[in-house]
Regions:
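Sec/Tat signal peptide C-region and signal peptidase I cleavage site
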Residues: 10-16
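Glycine-centered loop/turn positions within well-structured domains
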Residues: 3, 195-197, 363
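Bacterial N-terminal signal peptides
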Residues: 1-9
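GH16 jelly-roll
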Residues: 16-275, 420-421
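Residue-level signal for beta-strand positions within conserved beta-sheet cores that form or flank
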Residues: 12, 132, 226, 363, ...
Length: 440
């Protein structure tokens, strides 16, 4: 599906003059208020090779990502690590900085990419499941076609991906720069407004895509906030290289970023998590009467989703006038989740997730929280740590220390409460009430 147009000459930019966000990488270390990491080989989220056949293991080690001479350095290395032949890093601002519309500028130096390195500077939407969340690729290098014609170190690509009638849709262009890109820094700019996305390198526009008034496509993916990603992959479908021996690019290879700057455009919105930190104390997730410093309001900033095999049942609440009470049939998994906008809950580190739960089921279930690191779960196995739960059909307070959740990023919480179970052997009735976060 092709819904955009590409231009060879730079048209007038809608660049505003108001700088609303920047990272100049001048600190002693990568700013954790802005950046977090994807770690692993993708298998942990069901996307081995990150869905692209990549051969690196992403880490958060300084060997792979650090500040050096006022620049962000992402370094790919040939080394055996966690069963993979290479290491590198992928940084993202998910849950920390998102924006909709604006002029985004980055000064980047790519490594020698031929053959096998794949530096990328891109964005993902904050809502939905790919491709329905939308993807904007501002710069990718090391593509197979450029390797084939000898322009790997001069050619870049830009693209957008979205959902079109339930299928993946794409639009992409490529541009061959007059000089090798690895010898110096180059300025990559995107202008994004309600009508169009444009991209340029060193003032030369090479991509334009209309995102309004397109027959048969809402393109809603490009009218919501996105977050940034920076990574240096090794191998994969984009490069056409799928064996370690095929990687001939010099290693270690470094992608360096001098700065990122966002200027405000008409209709723009910006979210910076550190400016919206939830106050310490108690934060109400699903509670009517608990004294809280802040709380979710369902239908406004939160939604309860019944994912599968849950039917409401009559049950008196533990408190107030509302309760989550459901029946799950035998033989089918069941689950629910409370979703909200990203929330910075850092003040609750060292605290606990508290709730009241009532059930008699002997089967295993798990309670979780979703953050920028993915899903984090605590299992409730008969005979194991029940965190206060007694399966006797009476209300009991359950208190789970946040430290019990593996790999939890409280600075970017998306699903504040989840409960999931594998198919039970017999029907289950379960009731949940008075759910809140308690700080230390």
């Amino acid at each position: 599906v092709l819904l955009g147009t590409a231009c060879a000459a730079l048209t007038p930019q809608l660049r505003a003059q108001t700088l609303v966000w920047e990272d100049n990488f001048n600190g002693p270390a990568i700013d954790g208020n802005t950046w977090t990491y994807d770690v692993g080989n993708g298998c942990q989220i069901g996307l081995c090779g990150w869905g692209n056949g990549e051969m690196q293991y992403y880490t958060s080690r300084p060997e792979n990502a650090r500040i050096e001479n006022g620049r962000l350095v992402i370094e790919a290395r040939r080394e055996a690590f966690q069963g993979m032949p290479f290491t590198s890093a992928r940084l993202k601002t998910e849950g920390r900085m998102h924006f909709k519309y604006g002029t985004l500028e980055a000064r980047i130096k790519t490594p020698v990419v031929g053959n096998g390195l794949w530096p990328a500077y891109w964005m993902l939407g904050t809502i939905g499941v790919w491709p329905g969340r939308g993807e904007i690729d501002l710069m990718e290098a090391g593509m197979a076609a450029a390797i084939a014609n000898g322009t790997a170190n001069r050619r870049i690509g830009a693209a957008v991906h979205w959902d079109y009638n339930g299928a993946q849709a794409d639009y992409d262009t490529s541009y061959t720069h007059p000089v090798d890109l690895h010898n110096d820094f180059h300025v990559y700019r995107m202008t994004w407004d309600p009508n169009v996305i444009r991209m340029s390198i060193d003032g030369q526009q090479h991509f334009e895509f209309a995102i309004s008034n397109i027959e048969g496509a809402s393109l809603h993916e490009f009218h919501q906030q996105h977050y940034l990603l920076l990574n240096l992959a090794v191998g994969g479908t984009f490069t056409g290289i799928n064996t370690p021996g095929g990687v001939t690019a010099p290693l270690p290879g470094k992608m360096e970023v001098d700065y990122l700057r966002l200027y405000q455009n008409p209709g723009a919105s910006l979210y910076v998590g550190a400016q919206h930190t939830a106050p310490a104390g108690r934060f109400g997730v699903f509670t009517d009467q608990t004294d809280t410093a802040a709380r979710l309001t369902f239908g406004q900033d939160a939604q309860l989703y019944l994912w599968n095999n849950l039917s409401p049942i009559a049950q008196a609440p533990f408190e107030g006038g509302n309760v989550m009470a459901y029946r799950a049939n035998a033989g089918t998994w069941y689950g629910l989740g409370i979703q909200t906008d990203y929330r910075d809950m850092r003040n609750y580190a060292g605290g606990s997730l508290k709730l009241h739960l009532k059930t008699t089921t002997p089967s295993t279930f798990k309670i979780g929280i979703n953050t920028s690191f993915g899903d984090s779960w605590v299992d409730f196995v008969p005979g194991g740590n029940q965190y206060g739960l007694v399966r006797d059909g009476v209300w009991h307070e359950v208190s789970i220390p946040f430290i019990a959740f593996y790999d939890l990023d409280l600075q970017s919480v998306k699903q504040m409460f989840m409960l999931v179970a594998d198919p039970p052997a017999s029907p289950v009735e379960i009731a949940i009430d008075k759910v809140y976060y308690q700080s230390r």
